[in-house]
């Protein structure tokens, strides 16, 4: 079955679209990536999305116009990715503007802006969307969902395999080995903490909006990280919390960045970016080290995807802080680093059409469930 997958992540920089052919066993499908397209949001649309996610007061009409603009961008990306219209169904994540993980005192919830009926009508295809709500309603974190793609498409090997996504948020998947004492272990996955969310905000603030991100990590490479500040940050509650856990821009946004800037013992702009970038690497390394201490689980390979995989400074920091782990791009296994999450929602749409439930181990939902809501054109 030809499936379109559409994803716009926490960085809110645009829409990634993929066209994938899935066939065979639902648990271990044969697959082929036929096309991929990345469409950038306009500067104004990106700013509107980020402001909305950080508490900007909007009227009902403002929300309506924002969701329409996001839907039109998704339609454009889908049309470019599948110009001949060969796809049968579309898996669309939408644009997250609020993700609230569950706590003992309140129910979890997540809101992705997209007008799915409009998108289905424009494309003339069934659209599967709202993948997180059912998971949250059943007590799960609602995120991350991409680990299910890693398990199905990358698969198991002789040792534990890790997949790290460096989008707006850094999240990990750990795939158990085929043999050995850990062969009966479950797939693991969780959000580690901020990645491009804080790094991009830092660059935008320092350059007064003249730059949107640190290309290749050049600014960070010229600076010196404040390791004392990072050591303090790693003791915060979220980073001490065991999986399953999830987070978003609501926690790691402009206010959080301002607080961290005030705690860095340097006013040098390159030092500021280096510290925020190194913080992401330390968050990931701490999670991997804690897991090894508690469960003797350590991946031999760590495949990295997302925009952060192109940040040379960040990749070096992760490699240096993860001894004994081979760090490489998902490109090495045929999954473009920018396409992984869009492929995940294509897979979830295919599973929805075939009524395949996901398991409970990654997000913590109480029972297996089919994720997503279907809308016809």
From Swiss-Prot:
What keywords would UniProt list here? ATP-binding, Carbohydrate metabolism, Kinase, Nucleotide-binding, Transferase
Which intervals of the chain form a coiled coil?
none
Q: Which is one Pfam family of this protein?
A: AnmK
EC number(s) reported in the record: 2.7.1.170
Which top EC class is named for this enzyme in its record?
transferase
Record-annotated residues binding ATP? 9-16
Which GO molecular function entries does the Swiss-Prot or TrEMBL record give? Answer: ATP binding; kinase activity; phosphotransferase activity, alcohol group as acceptor
Q: What does this protein do?
A: Catalyzes the specific phosphorylation of 1,6-anhydro-N-acetylmuramic acid (anhMurNAc) with the simultaneous cleavage of the 1,6-anhydro ring, generating MurNAc-6-P. Is required for the utilization of anhMurNAc either imported from the medium or derived from its own cell wall murein, and thus plays a role in cell wall recycling.
**In its UniProt entry, what is this protein called?**
Anhydro-N-acetylmuramic acid kinase
Species in which this protein is naturally found: Prochlorococcus marinus (strain SARG / CCMP1375 / SS120)
């Amino acid at each position: 079955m030809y499936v379109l997958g559409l994803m716009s992540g926490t960085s809110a920089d645009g829409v990634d679209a993929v066209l994938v052919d899935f066939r065979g066993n639902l648990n271990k499908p044969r697959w082929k990536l036929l096309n991929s397209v990345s469409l950038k949001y306009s500067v104004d649309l990106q700013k509107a999305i980020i402001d909305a996610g950080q508490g900007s007061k909007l009227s009902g009409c403002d929300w309506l116009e924002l969701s329409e603009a996001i839907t039109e961008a998704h339609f454009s990306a889908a049309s470019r990715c599948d110009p001949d219209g060969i796809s049968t169904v579309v898996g669309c994540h939408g644009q997250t503007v609020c993700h609230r993980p569950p706590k003992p005192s309140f129910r979890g919830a997540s809101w992705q802006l997209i007008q799915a009926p409009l998108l289905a009508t424009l494309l003339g295809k069934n659209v599967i969307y709202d993948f997180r709500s059912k998971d949250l309603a059943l007590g799960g974190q609602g995120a991350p969902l991409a680990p299910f793609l890693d398990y199905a498409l990358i698969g198991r090997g002789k040792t534990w395999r890790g997949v790290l996504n460096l989008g707006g948020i850094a999240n990990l998947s750990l795939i158990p080995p085929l043999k050995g004492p850990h062969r009966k272990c479950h797939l693991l996955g969780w959000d580690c903490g901020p990645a491009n969310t804080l790094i991009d905000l830092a660059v935008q603030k320092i350059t007064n909006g003249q730059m949107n991100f640190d290309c290749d990590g050049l600014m960070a490479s010229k600076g010196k990280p404040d390791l004392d500040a990072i050591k303090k940050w790693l003791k915060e509650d979220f980073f001490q919390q065991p999986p399953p856990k999830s987070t978003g821009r609501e926690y790691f946004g402009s206010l959080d960045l301002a607080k961290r800037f005030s705690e860095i013992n340097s006013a040098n702009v390159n030092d500021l970016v280096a510290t925020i970038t190194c913080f992401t690497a330390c968050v990931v390394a701490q999670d991997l080290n804690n897991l090894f201490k508690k469960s003797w689980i350590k991946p031999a390979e760590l495949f990295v995807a997302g925009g952060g995989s192109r940040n040379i400074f960040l990749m070096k920091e992760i490699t240096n802080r993860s001894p004994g782990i081979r760090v490489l791009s998902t490109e090495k296994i045929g999954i473009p680093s920018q396409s992984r999450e869009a492929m995940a929602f294509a897979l979830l749409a295919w599973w929805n059409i075939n009524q395949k439930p996901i398991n409970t181990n990654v997000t913590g939902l109480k029972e297996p469930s089919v994720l997503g809501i279907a809308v016809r054109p």
